[in-house]
Each structure stands twice: as structure tokens, then as C-alpha cells.
């Protein structure tokens, strides 16, 4: 059951941004050919639900999945509605991947059903650039409602599937999501001197409608929300391509 007071406050806040005129694209590319070439829409559909989960219940993988979503939202236009169940988001961390605090509207839900209802309300509004939520349980019927709301509002929906205390794969249950992603931390980029380099992630496209899965080792989002292929991998790929042409 959704919380009427939260929905009412959200509607009041959204009325303050009505009337914005934004140019809508059909898809948001990653700008990485290896990923965009695999995605059925040559990018993430901007009128669809996409699910993300950390590879484990650990804090590192959970943070990586959160920042992966924040980077996507940073590259979309306009305000972002972020619906939470717990107050563990670190706004300066979101800003480091390009999602400024001034763009984010926060809503706190009392349970997963409340969270999904608030997300649906935001998706239908049409003046938001992205709607993000975090839930442990979102069944096929609930995700189908989110997908229909995303299509109707032409707004991207990003749902972080958190690990349940009982264990299991958060992406194992049936879902109407167009894409499903699993994010894991990886050893950071090596530096020529002592220090910590740019974070790296193992990004796995577990499933997508109309396309194949895939997995990539990437450098984490920069201040513009963009991931990158590590330089060493680019050089090795270029060298391999040259050898193939010579053969």
C-alpha cells in the first residue's frame, strides 16, 4: 500500500517543474562501441525499465551498482527522482560521477510497495529525466507496471535490486525490465607511482530483450558520468586488430 502523504508531497514538488521543454532521445549510448554495439537499441532505451544489482551483498559492489546508475542519470537530461528505503546515499559521491545535488529530488518510502508506487508516479510525470529506486522485492507484475509507466512517460527507470538477507540472486526472478545488469568492483587502474588509481568495475549485461548478454571490464564513471575502457585494453585490442589485418 502506497503512502498517500508521500505521493501528495511528490505531486506538489513535481508541479513546480511542469512545463519544461526537453528534447527526448530514444536511447542513451554509453559511448563505448563494445557495449553500444551489443545493446539492441545501440544504448539504453530512455522509455524503459533497467535493473541493476551488485555482484554481492558487500558494500563495495553495492556502491558500484549505485554509482553506475547515478552515472546513467547524470547523462540524461533534467531532474532525477531518487526513491530510497534507507538513508545511506552519499550526495558528494553522486556528484563525483556527474549527478549534481541540485538535480536530485529525494523521496523516502516505507516499504518496497510504497517505493514502487512512488516510482510509478514519477515516471508518468514526463518532466523528469530519470527515476531511480532501490528494492529487494519487485515481482513481474510490479516491474511490468514500471515498464508501462516508463513507456507512457518516456522516462528511463533504474531499479537497484538489493540482495535479500536470505541470499539468492536479486536478478533471478522474472522481470519486465528491458535490460538487467550486474556490477562488481575490480582492482583499480595501476599508477606509475604509489597511490590509488581510477576505480574499475566488472559490468555484466545479464539479460536484455532482443539482444545478447555481455560483460566488460571498465573504468568507473568519471565526473561526466561516463565509463571508459582501460587504456591497456584499448592498446591490446588495437594491436590484435593490426595483427589480424596483417595476417
Give the positions of each predicted feature.
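Conserved beta-strand scaffold positions in the cores of enzyme catalytic domains, especially
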Residues: 49-51, 106, 180
Amino acid at each position: 500500500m502506497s503512502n498517500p502523504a508521500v505521493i501528495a508531497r511528490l505531486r506538489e514538488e513535481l508541479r513546480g517543474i511542469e512545463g519544461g521543454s526537453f528534447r527526448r532521445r530514444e536511447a542513451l549510448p554509453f559511448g563505448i562501441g563494445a557495449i553500444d554495439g551489443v545493446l539492441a537499441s545501440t544504448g539504453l532505451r530512455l522509455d524503459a525499465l533497467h535493473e541493476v544489482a551488485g555482484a554481492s551483498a558487500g558494500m563495495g559492489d553495492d556502491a558500484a551498482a549505485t554509482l553506475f546508475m547515478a552515472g546513467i542519470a547524470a547523462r540524461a537530461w533534467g531532474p532525477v527522482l531518487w526513491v530510497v528505503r534507507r538513508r545511506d546515499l552519499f550526495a558528494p559521491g553522486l556528484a563525483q560521477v556527474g549527478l549534481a545535488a541540485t538535480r536530485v529530488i529525494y523521496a523516502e518510502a516505507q516499504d518496497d510497495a510504497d517505493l514502487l508506487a512512488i516510482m510509478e508516479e514519477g515516471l508518468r510525470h514526463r518532466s523528469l529525466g530519470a527515476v531511480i529506486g532501490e528494492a529487494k522485492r519487485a515481482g513481474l507484475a510490479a516491474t511490468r507496471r514500471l515498464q508501462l509507466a516508463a513507456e507512457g512517460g518516456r522516462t528511463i527507470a533504474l531499479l537497484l535490486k538489493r540482495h535479500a538477507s536470505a541470499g539468492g540472486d536479486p536478478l533471478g526472478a522474472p522481470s519486465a525490465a528491458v535490460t538487467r545488469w550486474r556490477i562488481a568492483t575490480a582492482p583499480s587502474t595501476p599508477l606509475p607511482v604509489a597511490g590509488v588509481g581510477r576505480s574499475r568495475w566488472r559490468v555484466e549485461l545479464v539479460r536484455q530483450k532482443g539482444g545478447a548478454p555481455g560483460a566488460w571490464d571498465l573504468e568507473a564513471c568519471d565526473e561526466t558520468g561516463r565509463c571508459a575502457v582501460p587504456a591497456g585494453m584499448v592498446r591490446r585490442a588495437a594491436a590484435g586488430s593490426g595483427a589480424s589485418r596483417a595476417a
